[in-house]
């Protein structure tokens, strides 16, 4: 779809998001959707909302407006659910439950994800960050390139989840290798081979977590799995093994790849906006503001994988969504809606300085962690990992720069990378990423250039105004 041409319709936004142009830079297409087709009906019959106000309303609305799929109708919204372990595990996660089941499960687990409990992990997270940076330092100091995506962004959440779950680090690294396959298999447009790969990875994860739960019953330690094994409320209600497995599966899927992607984008933002690094050198509120703006500018999960089912005919922006329709929300488009965030393509941490987490100074919600009762349970854990990482990366490697063109993962769902090569630049050799790079235009300033899709090599120009 050429956004330069006058376009009157888009047959399927999900297919367009998987196109090479959108993998490179999805935001022109998302802008077109907001302006011309904000309540989009895809070829599959799914509806996709792209305006901030509509997304907030859909995520918050419960009861008479939207619900999750009931167990008996799973096949209606996931046609391959009868034979797919991954889709059945997804259906059993907290994100797919509605009150009162959701209320019960959230109550049993939420005490272990309080800000105090997550903050208690800060010393361990800081230790992991320091160790990973120590491991990268020798190669960087020799002038070599290091893949920050694999050596740091992927490794840190693996180490944190191993600590959180009380399991060996090598075991976590093994499980984490299959997360990307599972996420792609859960996409609305996943092929049969993709779903088969997802199910194989889910089977390994399910078997491991089943064994882990049994070990925690025999030898409980001070970790979240042992705590959840013994979790109960005042009525002595406990979590079943099946509920525990789906919860651990969902936590790992929801908090690993997304955190890694945000670390990548945060480091790129540091490099693209050197005049904004002061946010990482002052008080904690400045670091938090920088993190929130990274999450707003590049939501790691671009749209919701969880269906919201219309309880009745609903009219939005002049479009009628019929009863029982499957509605998804395009989070990344809502985060860049000019009706919610002034000058939305501008990287400006000031819009979140001194506010409650996820809330702009104008009172608008950053949508990357969701909204309403299904707000991401691991949001604070992700924020702490970012807050502990970014100031340390900047202090340890102040001359860090990209070594070559980063490689994006060809995913319509996750905005992430396959590789992010970095190096230390020598005195007088200081290429700088343009802000446009973060939005898909490739290149650096300072005389360096990268190859564009047409094969021509040229220096980049910044199409976004720098703060």
UniProtKB/Swiss-Prot annotation:
Residues 444-467 are annotated as: Disordered. Keywords: Heme, Iron, Metal-binding, Monooxygenase, Oxidoreductase, Plasmid. Coiled coil: none annotated. Heme binds at residue 376. Its EC number is 1.14.14.-. It is an enzyme of class 1 (oxidoreductase). InterPro entries: Cyt_P450, Cyt_P450_B, Cyt_P450_CS, Cyt_P450_sf. One of its GO terms (molecular function) is heme binding. It holds the Pfam family p450. Residues 451-467 have a biased composition (Basic and acidic residues). Its cofactor is heme. Belongs to the cytochrome P450 family. Cytochromes P450 are a group of heme-thiolate monooxygenases. They oxidize a variety of structurally unrelated compounds, including steroids, fatty acids, and xenobiotics. PANTHER family: CYTOCHROME P450 YJIB-RELATED (PTHR46696:SF1), P450, PUTATIVE (EUROFUNG)-RELATED (PTHR46696). This is Cytochrome P450 BJ-3 homolog.
